[in-house]
């Protein structure tokens, strides 16, 4: 289901409102698991199922690995979506096609659509998706809208329960170096860290 607030005559949030919304969502807390991202993407028409992925995990080196792989794919003629973190200057760096960041207009349109679904989810008894889950769903939505041939994305910090693990069309999975940083976040013992990725 393709829905655009611009097609209905409604006014989408502006960039500042979008950033305030994401900041507010960060105060809602986290419920471990994939239930929220799965439900949000279902309501968006499961955009991730129409995409192919190179999925990169690890403690260090994910960004460099993503840059190498996406540049190679782009040079080979693919329309490459990139989902990265952290950002250096601008929030829109998180979601790129080739070397072009998502525009403020597309970001706001996507977040407006997602916000409506999140509000409906809460009304239906679901936990509100986290900022990372919203960003991940936004990336999937945007890359499908822009018809990317392949998406290169980094995991977050959630191990098996990371929102990016919703994808089922991974073409290549890449492990960069793995350290102990995830232990404090996921509350795993040292020997469990690698098996949880």
Language-model-detected regions and their locations in the chain:
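Hydrophobic anchor at the beta1->P-loop junction of P-loop NTPases
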Residues: 56
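Conserved small/polar residues in nucleotide/adenosyl-binding loops
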Residues: 186-193
């Amino acid at each position: 289901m393709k829905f655009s607030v611009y097609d209905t005559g409604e006014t989408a949030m502006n960039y500042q409102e979008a950033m305030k919304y994401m900041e507010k969502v960060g105060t809602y807390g986290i419920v471990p698991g994939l239930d929220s991202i799965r439900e949000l993407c279902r309501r968006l028409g499961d955009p991730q199922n129409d995409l192919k992925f190179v999925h990169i995990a690890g403690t260090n080196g994910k960004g460099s690995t993503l840059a190498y792989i996406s540049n190679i794919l782009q040079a080979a003629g693919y329309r490459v979506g990139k989902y990265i973190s952290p950002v250096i200057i601008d929030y829109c760096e998180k979601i790129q096609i080739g070397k072009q960041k998502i525009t403020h207009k597309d970001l706001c349109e996507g977040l407006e659509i997602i916000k409506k679904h999140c509000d409906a989810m809460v009304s239906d008894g679901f936990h509100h998706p986290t900022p990372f889950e919203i960003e991940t769903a936004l990336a999937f939505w945007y890359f499908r809208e822009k018809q990317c041939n392949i998406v290169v994305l980094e995991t977050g910090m959630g191990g098996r329960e990371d929102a990016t693990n919703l994808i089922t069309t991974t073409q290549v999975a890449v492990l960069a170096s793995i350290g102990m940083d995830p232990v404090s976040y996921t509350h795993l013992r040292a020997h469990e860290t690698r098996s949880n990725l």
